[in-house]
Amino acid sequence: MHIMNVGLRKWLYRVMPWLAGVLLTGLVGGTVLVTDGSLPSDLQGEQWMWLSAVMTVVLPSWLAGYIVNPQRTVCIVSETVQWVLMGFGAVEALHGLGQIAGIYPSNHSLFVLTGTFYNPGPYSGYLAAVLPIALYRIMIFNGKKDRLSVVQYYLSMCVLLLICSVLPAGMSRAAWFASLVSCGYVVLRVYHVKVKSFVSEHRYAVLGVLILGLLFASGAYFMKRDSADGRLLIGKITSRAIACNPLGEENGRTFSAIYGDAQERYFTDCEYSESEAWVAGTPDFAFNEYLQIAVEYGVWVSVLLVTVLLVLSMIAGNRKHLAGMGGCLVSLMVFACFSYPLHIPAIVSVWLLAVIVLSGEGLVMIKRKRYAVAVLLSVVVAGLTASVNRYGKYSARTRAVRQWMPVRVLYHSGAFKAAADEYEKLYDKMSWHKDFCFEYGRALYKTGSYGKAEKVLLKAMTVSGDPMILNILGRSAQESGEYEKAEMYLLRSTRRLPERVYPHYLLVKLYAEPEYFDRVKLVREAEYVLNAEPKVNSTAIREMRQKVKNILKDKSMQ
């Protein structure tokens, strides 16, 4: 029996690290390949469920491997994570090249290149996170003559070339910047002595590189100037929202709803430029994860996250063999300043792998193993709790959305009474979804259930900042004879997005009501509708202007 126990311990000593490494990287990394075309692309329910489910398996495996053989587990996990991420990065790059060539379909009607993602931005961010790993592997195997090193060198080179060939086509400035910063980090970590010597001997060359960098940044800005100005405005208004409530949201509202209210206050109370009004929108994300976390959960949570990431970066900085994973983390941190990678499960899987590798290396530095195991155990328990909760959340949401999809056909076909009846059955399950709440409220408005429509649309205001909700609230109040309330809602809509013509058109119709007629206000709003420069001069704009002219003619004010 004793011999058998010794043999079992030796077997576990050898096998558990590999089991932890393979399970961890294969299952978590595979999140990027999980898709379900039958669901709305922005839900990503299947990916969240997959990632949550596999984390309940891999976290205990990681803990067991660390307890049995910490050094070997950390080493194997680090190596397998890098190679698996490069493998999935190569698959994504090939998929993207196939989409450019027309072999594979895109997942977005407006973009040719998306990979397995629904948008080229997250797709490019994923590739940007893998790129520094491939660069690091090339550097460490460069010049080595043994067969295994040569094979690894050329495999890494293939991955790097594939990513570099497709990354520019994604047109994601955030991903480009993350790639440059993270690859620069890897070069500095591997060749820091040579870089330091080069800088001291070739200062003018370094100055030239800095000037080129500034030119690159300027070109990236002017390439999509309105988009860049819009992001700056989002950051400005998000910061104001944080200043109003630094402890985070207490009423369960989403970022979109909080931002919509903050933008409305900004355009009401502050002096703003015409360019700000022109680029204003209704974003679902802050395009800066640190700011968005501060808005939703409080500044302290954002500071805690940044602190953890900086500690992990310091761990990577203390060990040269972690330069690749350190570059991966740097890429993700930079990308998070300009995008929303924590809302994309495939990129969250890369975050998790980077954190697991670097935290594992940090735990090995702790001299007393029992302290390290205690820390790891608490992390695993917290991770398991979060995984179970997230799986339950997205499992319920996915089931509800599957029930909603066939019913939604009624709404889009104009059968509003039947749609409202079916939406009522799903309301408790779907009240978190902004499109569902808007459609349900509009269907109730169309069927004359104005009181109920107002209740549902006010709920929609807690999950969305879209001013169209205010427009429907205004129309509903007008139809029910509550003209002052209708005016309040429509004026709020004009302040939320000042460049929108539609709410001004609705105000023209409101002020033309015999019971609420106001000549001065009617003329003011009519002049805006007739003279404003719309972003898109569509048929709808021309029809609204013609109707306004008819109203003015009827009131004998032309």
Model-derived regions, located:
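Alpha-solenoid helical repeat scaffolds
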Residues: 404-405, 435-439, 468-475, 501-506, ...
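Hydrophobic alpha-helical transmembrane segments in integral membrane proteins
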Residues: 217-233, 380-413
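Alpha-helical transmembrane segments of multi-pass inner-membrane proteins
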Residues: 11-37, 50-66, 76-109, 115-196, ...
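Short coil turns that delineate tetratricopeptide repeat
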Residues: 431-432, 464-465, 498, 534
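Interfacial juxtamembrane loops and adjacent helix segments
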Residues: 240, 251-295
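Register position in tetratricopeptide repeats
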Residues: 412, 446, 479-480, 513-514
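Internal/C-terminal transmembrane anchor helices
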Residues: 201-220, 368-393
